[in-house]
Amino acid sequence: MYCVEDRFRQGLTEEEREGLTATEAREANKQRLRSPHLLLLAETDEGLQNLYRLNYYAATQGFYGKPRIDLKLLAKYSKGLIATTTCVISNMARYFQNKEIDKMTGFFNDIAGIFGPDNLFIEMHPHDLDMQLEYNQVLIEMFRKEYEGFKCILANDVHYVRKEHNDTHNF
């Protein structure tokens, strides 16, 4: 992420500069490959600096196949960030798939303790996959009962909109 803002915004008009800087933060855990992740978005300038810090530490201290962070580091640099629970490769979804609902809610409680209801969103996807549909239903039921203050977002796991955005995405 080094200098991403400067390089990405170079030559853009003021209107074209609108947007949020975000990253899929992979979690350092025992499961070394295809580690679960959270989506982190910089809401403020301080959040942007924290996003840079997290990416720096992920690349220099947590790298194992991919840059990774742990929840302790995330808690230290969470101010100004918004998080979402992401897709079916998230910790919560994996716990659900393994029928470990206690671990699923435990993980959510951990990240809820870091971000709170104003900066953590439960992410659901409209994909017509049995696994996704079941996971969405569990999220709806669980969060209606236990986590009323948290909001849901509907996402599509789209990393870029147009083919020509690929260069910026892979930047």
State what each model feature region is.
Residues M1-F171:
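Phosphodiester-processing cores and adjacent nucleic acid-binding clamps
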